[in-house]
Regions:
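Nucleotidyltransferase catalytic core that binds NTPs
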Residues: 1-144
Length: 144
């Protein structure tokens, strides 16, 4: 009988996707099937003031990654992915290098549903989507 793979959730804005995201997803895929919880365009606009790439574009890129089983849009009106985690109830919620136990509001949801939390998946913080966009603005590349 084939052993069922663990369901591993990762989350983020992925706007734009960068090498740190690639490494996090690759590391998560070694643990099981990856479900990417991708923040919504309205969430990005509330957090950063803009959406560099649409959810549809980010989703298409993320679905192309090896090991990604699905990409779902976060129900993130409250600023978290708690509602989405409660719905999918993965085995593991894997967090990248910019998330820590003291800045992750999803901890209580994970405890409630017995979702294991992992930190530093894919290594430490390597790059910032916001910094990439700021650098592009500095060299004169404009969005839209």
């Amino acid at each position: 009988m084939k052993k069922k793979k663990k369901l591993i959730a990762v989350s983020g804005g992925f706007d734009p996707v960068h090498v740190g995201h690639v490494r996090m997803i690759q590391a998560a895929a070694k643990l099981g099937d990856v479900i990417v919880i991708c923040n919504s365009d309205p969430w990005l606009k509330r957090k950063k003031g803009y959406s560099f790439m649409s959810f549809r574009e980010r989703s298409e890129i993320l679905k192309a990654f090896k090991g990604v089983k699905d990409v779902i849009e976060a129900k993130d009106d409250d600023g978290t992915v708690c509602e989405t985690l409660a719905e999918i109830q993965p085995d593991v919620f894997a967090n990248g290098g910019d998330r820590y136990s003291d800045n992750t509001p999803e901890i209580q949801t994970c405890k409630k549903y017995a979702i294991e939390m992992l930190w530093g998946v894919g290594g430490g913080k390597i790059q910032s989507s916001s910094d990439l966009v700021a650098n592009m603005k500095q060299v004169g590349i404009k969005n839209g």
